[in-house]
């Protein structure tokens, strides 16, 4: 009887204490800004111990939770929460490929490319054979942020880790082109064309078509840039525009006067100094839908 009474009293005390603790926690919670409520992911060091060796299981659990709840928070803090969450997930399971991919996808929605690249760099360092993470980060840099230097960095990593995939060389060549490195881009396209000149597969034909288009375009861009630079140098030196392009060669401003990829001379407007190509590449007409 006494034992039963003691047990009941103990339960009553525990209940009273828990109610009091709950009230204190609720009161404390009310003092936090709305965006900080109901969110706490422990540190990676803590979870590595608390997981009792089941790190992959806890990484999966936190990953599933993060997909459901991350968008409930204000933009001012949401991305820091998100980055912390995926930092913890990938600390628990560094090979969790989907965590890097989904984390970067969510971060890109708020255009937090700085955090996208931090998470991508972590994944690439911890997974030295993984090329998809580099490709993934490069696509955000190229297509969304339009940071072609950053895109080039990741596409080159992807191509180095998976040299047998010509599509990655295509991306490297395009990143060089959009960054303004026409000579490097031209070199890549020429290599691609040479590698696939006899490839009759659909992909091989596409790469040859793409290479032809870009070789034509880049050759023209390089020529026009070279001629325009010579025209500008002539104008600054002589105080007037040259009478014609041939005078640039005669007076030492150009070694030779290039022709366009079709072998035709470039056009020159004496009044404005503008230099243009008279045979733009009709790529659609030459290669149908390509």
Residue ranges and their predicted role:
Residues 85, 119, 154, 187-189:
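Alpha-helical solenoid repeat scaffolds, predominantly canonical TPR units
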């Amino acid at each position: 009887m006494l034992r039963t009474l003691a047990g009941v009293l103990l339960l009553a005390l525990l209940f009273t204490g828990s109610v009091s603790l709950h009230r204190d926690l609720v009161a404390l919670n009310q003092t936090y800004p709305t965006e900080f409520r109901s969110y706490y992911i422990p540190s990676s060091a803590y979870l590595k111990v608390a997981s009792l060796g089941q790190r992959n299981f806890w990484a999966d659990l936190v990953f599933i939770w993060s997909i459901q709840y991350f968008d409930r928070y204000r933009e001012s803090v949401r991305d820091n929460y998100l980055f912390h969450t995926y930092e913890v997930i990938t600390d628990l399971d560094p090979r969790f490929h989907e965590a890097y991919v989904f984390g970067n996808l969510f971060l890109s929605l708020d255009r937090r490319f700085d955090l996208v690249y931090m998470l991508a760099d972590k994944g690439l360092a911890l997974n030295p054979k993984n090329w998809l993470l580099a490709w993934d980060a490069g696509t955000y840099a190229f297509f969304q942020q339009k940071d072609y230097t950053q895109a080039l960095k990741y596409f080159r990593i992807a191509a180095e880790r998976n040299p047998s995939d010509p599509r990655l060389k295509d991306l490297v060549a395009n990143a060089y082109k959009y960054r303004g490195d026409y000579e490097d881009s031209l070199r890549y396209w020429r290599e691609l064309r040479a590698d696939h000149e006899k490839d009759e597969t659909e992909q091989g034909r596409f790469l040859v078509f793409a290479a032809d288009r870009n070789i034509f375009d880049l050759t023209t861009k390089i020529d026009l840039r070279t001629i325009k630079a010579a025209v500008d140098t002539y104008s600054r030196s002589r105080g007037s525009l040259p009478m014609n392009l041939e005078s640039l060669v005669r007076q030492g401003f150009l070694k030779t006067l290039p022709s366009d990829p079709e072998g035709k001379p470039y056009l020159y407007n004496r009044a404005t100094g503008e230099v243009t190509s008279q045979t733009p590449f009709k790529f659609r007409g030459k290669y149908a839908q390509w």
